[in-house]
Amino acid sequence: MIDLPKVYSGKVRDLYEVDDDHLLMVATDRLSAFDVVFTDLIPGKGKILTQMSNCWFAFFGNRVPNHLSDLMLDDVLPEKEVQAIAQRAVVVKKLQPVKIEAVVRGYLAGGGWKEYQAKGSISEITLPAGLQRASALPQALFTPSTKAGVGTHDAVSYTHLTLPTSDLV
């Protein structure tokens, strides 16, 4: 149990208020697909998600600004709570999120299948004719969409997908 006010519970992450400038972000073991959160958990998933994210933040270093804070878990939580969420949580700065969902598709399913049926493509990428539902795609596809409520995602055109590069220098 975390003795901080919970401010948000997402599909796989929970946010707790640390102070006016910081949040505690905890990656859970919840499983979600197609906007559905399943009742079964994947033990250790939250730790792996956090380690993967931290790996990328370290790789990009200060070349790409991010939400990580200099505060450590033991700066904001008692030792017992730190042990319970070790390796699955980070203290982050309160910032405005970039509401883009990064979807990588290996199979023709879900919204990708619907778009393929209508257009023969997914996210402006033309696919071979005659593919069936759940067919393996010729290569993995990056198909970004807006991060929104359940069932309300909109595809994002590659021409509109840009980083605020002026902030990166």
Region spans (language model):
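Active-site loop/lid in soluble adenylation, ligation, and acyl-transfer enzymes
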Residues: 1-148
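Feature captures the catalytic ectodomains and active-site-proximal regions of enzymes
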Residues: 151
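Conserved small/polar residues in nucleotide/adenosyl-binding loops
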Residues: 159-165
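Acidic, proline/serine/threonine- and glycine-rich low-complexity intrinsically disordered segments
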Residues: 155-157
